[in-house]
């Protein structure tokens, strides 16, 4: 869990991270200006963990790992979620910048992450 490997094919180089929580085999993929978050992170929050095979603690550890990874990616890159949900203002964005995700995503800024880090 929470291990990133580099995958290359032709001119495409991607980082693939095992990000369990929502599902045991969930992965996120980043490269070429995008972070494909799948069901780990949405534009404003994170994926569900009340499904068969979900693991809430693994999800929080995956979000913590993702946050550390996102802090080191270019801030203008796009975070693309696996699902689109309405925001409180009624918009339904397809993506957010990594900068905006780090500032406004509830899960990326949750006090739970501070507890996991031991702060």
Task: Show the residue positions of the predicted features.
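Conserved acidic catalytic loop of the alpha/beta-hydrolase fold
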Residues: 7-9
């Amino acid at each position: 869990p929470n291990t990133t490997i580099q995958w290359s094919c032709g001119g495409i180089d991607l980082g693939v991270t095992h990000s369990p929580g929502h599902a045991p085999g969930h992965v996120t993929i980043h490269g070429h200006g995008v972070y494909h978050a799948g069901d780990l992170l949405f534009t404003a929050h994170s994926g569900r963990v009340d499904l068969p095979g979900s693991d809430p603690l693994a999800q929080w550890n995956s979000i913590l790992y993702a946050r550390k990874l996102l802090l080191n990616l270019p801030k203008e890159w796009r975070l693309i979620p696996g699902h689109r949900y309405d925001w409180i203002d009624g918009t339904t964005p397809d993506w957010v910048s990594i900068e905006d995700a780090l500032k406004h995503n509830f899960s990326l800024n949750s006090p739970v992450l501070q507890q996991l880090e031991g702060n």
